[in-house]
Amino acid sequence: MAAKTVQYDNIYLNLSEKPGKLRIAPSGLGWKSPSLAEPFTLPISEIRRFCWSRFARGYELKIILKSKDPVSLDGFSQEDLDDLINVIKQNFDMGIEQKEFSIKGWNWGEANFLGSELVFDVNSRPAFEIPISAVTNTNLSGKNEVALEFSTTDDKQIPSAQVDELVEMRLYVPGTTAKEDAADGEEVEQNAANLFYESLKERADIGQAAGDAIVSFSEILLLTPRGRYDIDMYETCMRLRGKTYDYKVEYSSINSLFLLPKPDEQHVVFVIGLEPPLRQGQTRYPFLVTQFVRDEDMEVDLNIEETVLKEKYADKVKASYDQPAFEVVSQIFRGLTGRKVTTPAEFLSHEGHAAVKCSYKANEGQLYCLDKSFLFIPKPTLLMNTSDITRVTLSRVGMSVSAARTFDLTFTLRSGTSYQFSNINRVEQSALVAFLESKQIKIHNDLADETQQTLLTSALDDEDEEGDEEMEEALSEDEDFQAESESDVAEEYDENAESSDEEGASGAEGSE
């Protein structure tokens, strides 16, 4: 039979939101949607085989490629199968493998790596398939448990209420398995979870992290999450490799960079903001906090060809660096990610530092007053944009103001969330208030209210003491006062009563 061109309408490409038209021709196939400017084309030279199965929107024609991720075309009806078999046979001289997915609902089976996919089989039928390129991170979360983290959509036009995404999966891999030893060629027993983890990690590097790293940094100290990591930086992503955890971070997920000197004058921190955050089990890390010794130098050469450096990274990065380590790392991050590095604003503490020491709950740290935000480090790292702050309250709880050497600072955001930072030295109050006023942030000073209340209470106490003394004086008996005799009382009420003087005189006369 002669080859022919066939068109199918309302077909979705790789779970696209809107459908398009699929055209199958002798040279390959193409897909075009009104919502996209450029069509998707696939030449016959890249196609390995075709698969047919039940899918999200009816039936799917899955195309397995020789060197890339599989292509999913769904939206077909069951009646389209016979026509597709004939067209693909005529144009490509290939058949269509019909697959039935397991619908038993079992949560145990076999995990196999097939090309660029991880396939979970139940009774020799696939239960689900995961493109390895979608795995951004994998970690051993237990002796026999492997955690897989997946990339999330970056389409911010889709309302969050309409987006349900798989972000993490955990697989329990029990027992041991045999692995050939590269040294002597003999098979050795190895923990099955470890082998699965190493295999997945190796395959997950295929894709955007493929090729040689542009630059690598060794033994970089991270305060959050705690540990030392090797950082490999590629064209569009970086990898953090630690003793326990490995992470892959897309540059597109880096939303902020901060370079901040610590008050101890010996260290400098470089903070990397992430969205979505890094995950370790149930713990999320929206910020990576790295720390460098101020006097430590670093010398590196970038693995970039001179022509590429001039064309793609002109005025962004240099071919080589030999300067303080914190400057080298921050400048390379700025050049490769395209993000601005935020440094301290004009704020200076009482001791001339860019931050004030304080505590958030039970954690001690530093609060930086930046041009457009306030940042608390290291743990937990909290960022409060100036535009989101409704008011700041100064207070001192649990101690009289006159005796307090520290005070608390509470930030209230438009969302209703509040953050209280305590144990701030009293000498920092004037500088903080002046900075808040310069940013036109509403300030509620409970310290002044408490001071006035203390003075009023003290005045009332003094008045009470004076009143008590007057009352005591009124009620107490005069020491110079002597009570009169009963005769004095009689003289006052009885005119015939003899006075004591008369009695004394008559007595004297009688004696004479």
Curated annotation (Swiss-Prot):
The Gene Ontology biological process annotation of the record reads: constitutive heterochromatin formation; DNA repair; DNA replication; DNA replication-dependent chromatin assembly; nucleosome organization; pericentric heterochromatin formation; silent mating-type cassette heterochromatin formation; subtelomeric heterochromatin formation
Which controlled-vocabulary keywords does the entry list?
Chromosome, DNA damage, DNA repair, DNA replication, Nucleus, Transcription, Transcription regulation
Task: Give the residues annotated as coiled coil.
Answer: none
Where is composition skewed (Acidic residues) in this entry? 460-504
**What is the first-listed, main subcellular location in coarse terms?**
nucleus
* Top-level division of the source organism's lineage: Eukaryota
Question: Has UniProt tagged this entry with the keyword Signal?
Answer: no
Q: Which SMART domains match?
A: Rtt106 (SM01287)
Q: Does the keyword Nucleotide-binding apply?
A: no
Q: What span is annotated as the signal peptide, if there is one? A: none
Recorded phenotype for the gene knockout or disruption: Sensitive to methyl methanesulfonate (DNA damaging agent).
Cellular component per GO, a single term: nucleus
The protein's matches in InterPro entries, at most eight in alphabetical order, are given as: PH-like_dom_sf, RTT106/SPT16-like_middle_dom, RTT106/SSRP1_HistChap/FACT, SSRP1-like_PH1, SSRP1/POB3, SSRP1/POB3_N, SSRP1_DD, SSRP1_sf
Subcellular locations according to the entry: Nucleus; Chromosome
Q: Name one Pfam family in it.
A: POB3_N
Which GO terms fall under molecular function for this chain's record?
A: DNA binding; H2A-H2B histone complex chaperone activity; histone binding; nucleosome binding
Task: Fetch the Gene3D superfamilies from UniProt.
Answer: 2.30.29.150, Pleckstrin-homology domain (PH domain)/Phosphotyrosine-binding domain (PTB), Structure-specific recognition protein (SSRP1)
Renumbered to this chain, region (Disordered) spans 460-512
Q: What does this protein do?
A: Component of the FACT complex, a general chromatin factor that acts to reorganize nucleosomes. The FACT complex is involved in multiple processes that require DNA as a template such as mRNA elongation, DNA replication and DNA repair. During transcription elongation the FACT complex acts as a histone chaperone that both destabilizes and restores nucleosomal structure.
Binding partners and assembly: Forms a stable heterodimer with spt16. The spt16-pob3 dimer weakly associates with multiple molecules of nhp6 to form the FACT complex. Interacts with abo1.
Q: What else is known?
A: In contrast to the orthologous protein in animals and plants, this protein does not contain a HMG box DNA-binding domain. This function may instead be provided by the HMG box of the associated nhp6 protein in the FACT complex of fungi.
Spell out the family assignment given in the record's similarity comment: Belongs to the SSRP1 family.
| Protein name according to UniProt | FACT complex subunit pob3
Species: Schizosaccharomyces pombe (strain 972 / ATCC 24843) (Fission yeast)
